[in-house]
Amino acid sequence: MSPKKLPETIAQRTLRGMELLTQTDAYGVEVGLLATGKRYTVLISIHDPAGSAVTTRFTARLGVWSQWLQGLGLDDRVTGASLSVQTRENGSSSAIVGLSFTARPRPGADRKPLQRPQMVEEISTHLARILDGLRESSAGLMVRVCTAQDIVDLVRVAFDSSIAADVETARASGGTGLSWTDAPPRHEATAAAFYGHDRAVSTSWTMATRADEELPPLDFDTVLVPAPGVLCKRATLIYRIAPALEATLAPFGVVVTADVGGANGVPMAQALPSRQSLRTRLRLRAATSAQDTTFLAGLPLDLATPHMVMVPRELKETA
């Protein structure tokens, strides 16, 4: 009698639908690309070269980065973006920009659909200009495009924050040796108030952005301040094309996630909104009974699209 095959987790199913490619840009620099049909996503890492950046060095730039992202929407190949800032229990902070492109031009655009080799080449050619713009708004921080291995390691740690230090040590001494199939969690447990993934448990919230807001009215400094017992905090701003704004990218909403080491730590994670203003707390909604899909939408992979994962209802209502 053959053993039963365990059913795929939602994370395994979502990531299995994405192909991880390796390409070089116009300067011969390796670039990792996540491909899903005609959609391609590039990740750009923002770090402090000294490794000691405090959270405010990133949160203070959110407005500038948001304006830069909105301008990228004028390129008719760009379909969406995400901007994630995260902090770890040890106080380290970093940011990831996810940019998604499509081989299908927007309706009315004077372009033809591109095949994969053409699309990959076009993205690689445009990356230099894109990176220059981001570097101009990130003075003092290191900006670089993620390789395929960077993406693997990033996703592996996102699902198990407890191994973050081990992954950093391995990367500094020859590499982790992980592959794309190692990235998804092997275990998931979903409840109304939390989502368990490998050895971590997360709680997520969403907030929609109104048409007259540059950014959601969230105090990002207090949301992301490192806290004992909270392995990782992440706030991900999601951007989508807004035809009413002359096809620029516009803030669509934010997903906030706190990771702890087990179910006993969930009350600690759930206290995250307590330092926000009353009006902000009223708009920041717990992802009740949708913790797994909301966690995925908040990863720095620009996954919050209807064909990738179930878009949290709070955000879908503003689309």
Q: What is each model feature region?
A:
Residues 1-319:
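Extended, folded cores of ATP/NTP-driven motor/assembly subunits in large transport
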